[in-house]
Amino acid sequence: MIFKVFYQEKMTEVPVRENTKVLYLEADSERDVRAKLKKFAYNIEFVQSVTGAHLEYEKQNADLKLTEIV
């Protein structure tokens, strides 16, 4: 499943909408997404699963590039 993750790069700063970044990640669950991103110390605001029509929309209208985490 593909997830869209909204996050701030620094955990110590107050989230500001204009600084929110997005990445796409393939994972089994939201818990798996958070576990994979834990080592980066991002301030994760929201994790959204992207499927069906939403996935097709993201492919057409956004820079949908899956982030690979080793």
UniProtKB/Swiss-Prot annotation:
GO terms for cellular component: DNA-directed RNA polymerase complex. Gene3D superfamilies: RNAP, epsilon subunit-like (3.10.20.730). GO terms for biological process: DNA-templated transcription. InterPro entries: RpoY. Its EC number is 2.7.7.6. It catalyses: RNA(n) + a ribonucleoside 5'-triphosphate = RNA(n+1) + diphosphate. Pfam families: RpoY. Keywords: DNA-directed RNA polymerase, Nucleotidyltransferase, Transcription, Transferase. One of its GO terms (molecular function) is DNA-directed RNA polymerase activity. Belongs to the RNA polymerase subunit epsilon family. RNAP is composed of a core of 2 alpha, a beta and a beta' subunit. The core is associated with a delta subunit, and at least one of epsilon or omega. When a sigma factor is associated with the core the holoenzyme is formed, which can initiate transcription. HAMAP family: RNApol_bact_RpoY (MF_01553). A non-essential component of RNA polymerase (RNAP). This is DNA-directed RNA polymerase subunit epsilon. The gene is rpoY.
